[in-house]
Amino acid sequence: IETMKKLYILTVLILLTGFGTAFAQTLKGHIYDANTNEPLVGAAVTYKLHGNQGVVSDINGAYEIKLPEGGVDLVFSYVGYEDVLMPMVIGRRDVITKDVYMKESTKLLEEVVVSAGRFEQKLSNVTVSMDLVKASDIARQAPTDITSTLRTLPGVDIVDKQPSMRGGSGWTYGVGARSQILVDGMSTLNPKTGEINWNTVPLENIEQVEVIKGASSVLYGSSALNGIINIRTARPGLTPKTRFSAYVGVYGDAENDEYQWSDKSFWKDGKYSVKPILRGSLLSGIRNPIYEGFDLSHSLRIGHFDVSGSINLFTDEGYRQQGYNKRFRMGGNLTYHQPDMGMKILNYGLNVDFLTNQYGDFFIWRSPTEVYKPSPFTNMGREENNFHIDPFINYVNPENGTSHKIKGRFYHSADNIVRPSSGASITDILGNMGTNAQTIQNIAGGDYSSLYPALVGIGSGLINGNLEDAMNGVFTSLGNIFPNATTADYCDLISWVMDNGLPGDLGSIQNGQLPSDLIPWLSNVMNPSRNDSKTKTDKSYNYYLDYQFNKKWDGGAQITTGMTYEHVRYDSSIMDEIYKSDNVAAFFQYDQRFWDRLSVSAGVRAEYYRVDNHYREAETKILGTKVPFRPVFRAGLNYQLADYSFIRASIGQGYRNPSINEKYLRKDIGGVGIYPNLDIKPEKGYNAELGFKQGYKIGNFQGFVDVAGFYTEYKDMVEFQFGLFNNADYSMINSISDAIRMLMDGKGFGIGAQFHNV
């Protein structure tokens, strides 16, 4: 028995020794980009022996792999690069050093995107319609902001600064974008309004833009109702890089002389709202409106740090009156790559951005013959300053196929509405309306008797309690005083009255008397002592935290899951109130790759949302039971029919929560009011599509054809209604008669907009 034990132990030792020497051979080295010589982090080195065996490169691009004695076929692969096949013959206990240089793939469908699934994958494998724009494509267009480039994409449009995909946006000016806009995966939408200010996008430091068309709320939440636009910024390489550009443009005269709103002396007289730096020197000889811009960016690596920064200065006098824009943007990134992590990858850092911005909002034209002049009801511009700091940490463990990502944000914004112009004076308005020079001179001299008939016309009807007679009386009187008045002129007059107010003693008209304070009121408005061009400053604060976990298996399966929390505080100086909102969401997505041809994806999201004490903003019915959160789903597949031929199908749900401005805010914007409506419900919808993509190459010319058929349905879309509103309860006034009755009762009303579901 003892002899048997010795033989058994000896056999085990021999086997263990043989097993150890079988994989005692080592291949090591670095993996580089063949063009830039930069190390490729996370590149895979694999071979087949009883299944796939392999390792990945570390933060320095280094790899080390144990190989069996004899010959193997090694494959070096990296997303977005061409595979390198390396036959290798290695002797017992050999240690071989071999550096590998990989070429970036020049095939369009091999390009890498992250937006479709929150992880890197080939463009050809995504299950949704997606466009990709590289930095070189943007540079060739030399845009002043990214909207000029986005307009060139099929199915994408920018209507009054709002993004629209496949016609999916209604017309909610200044609030509630229905497409989510991201910079490096972080939303750039204003927390309180839900709108996009394109000046926040760092045009000077873009690597690529990824555009997904169709509902994408499962991974990106509210506002991804139409899709998403993800701007990915460039990161430093081994070689320091500095980029500077300067540009200038000149607007031509309007083709129709009636449309011309400026003349050749505007710049000298200081009538433009903003002044470009070169206007008073190099460009002083140009008489037409101009724009200019300067971009500067620099990036480099210092030890284990990635450092980048950029500055942008842009000034645009505007081809439309009140269409000006002036911005100064400064931002940067600092990333630290933790050394001595072996094959694991750990990096952390922060992004910082600051923007100060002045711009005009051209909302409604004054008249069909004055299309470049704004309506007096929309005499508004904005001054805005915002700052955000975004810390992050990323950890990747290729050994077990897991990754953890944490992103945060602190955001602060201060903005106010300004009046770019003081508006027409009462004498100018009367002159345009055809009032004779003597009447205007009398009014300017303090004789207001010519205006009495209009007020008496109202009173004659009110004495008898007949509002229709009152209106007929006033229109008859006004027709005599203003023989040449157009609708636009009356709008000027109404806007002027809204700005300067009315006599306080209007109730005396019902007794057939003129207001006792008519003369002091007229004297004050003819010689105004105030010119407050700004409203009070509103402030908003945003706190955001996002955690994402990803797990990959060798069989081609992977999951992406995580949670998001966002808190918004909005201090409204106009309402003298503070609004607070909280948003909590959890998401899960499963992706599987079969036979290296079929990609399948499915995901779900649940989101809770509240504003102040409105705790059930996301309330939904599930099987007849109300729950305080909203679930959404998506699914898709992509199948490779042949080389560079792909067919895809997908279906997804989307939603958009009304912004604080849409639902809760009362605000005056250039004479026009925004009125709250607590009955607004969230928008929701879904998108289903079937698509086919075919790549081609003819000589050095390559591209692809992408055809998609889709069906989109939306419910409870939010649109605004324009009209007269009761300033007390915010209800809409249905007739002029009701408005006059309110005035006679000493109650105020306003002109403005209110949002409703349609």
Indicate where each model-derived feature is located.
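Short, acidic Ser/Thr/Gly-rich low-complexity loop/linker segments typical of extracellular
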Residues: 50-62
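Short acidic/polar hinge/loop motifs at secondary-structure boundaries
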Residues: 64-66, 186-213, 234
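Structural signature of Gram-negative outer-membrane beta-barrels, strongest in the C-terminal barrel
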Residues: 552-568, 572-713
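Outer membrane beta-barrel strand-and-loop segments of large Gram-negative receptors
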Residues: 526-548, 677-681, 687, 698-758
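Flexible loop and strand-edge segments within Gram-negative outer membrane beta-barrel domains
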Residues: 316-331, 335-396, 410-430, 532-541, ...
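Short, acidic, small-residue-rich periplasmic hinge/interaction motif at the N-terminus
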Residues: 32-36, 43-48, 77-82, 91-139
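Extracytoplasmic beta-strand/coil segments of soluble accessory domains associated
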Residues: 147-186, 190
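Outer-membrane beta-barrel translocator/receptor signature
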Residues: 190-192, 205-207, 218-229, 235-330, ...
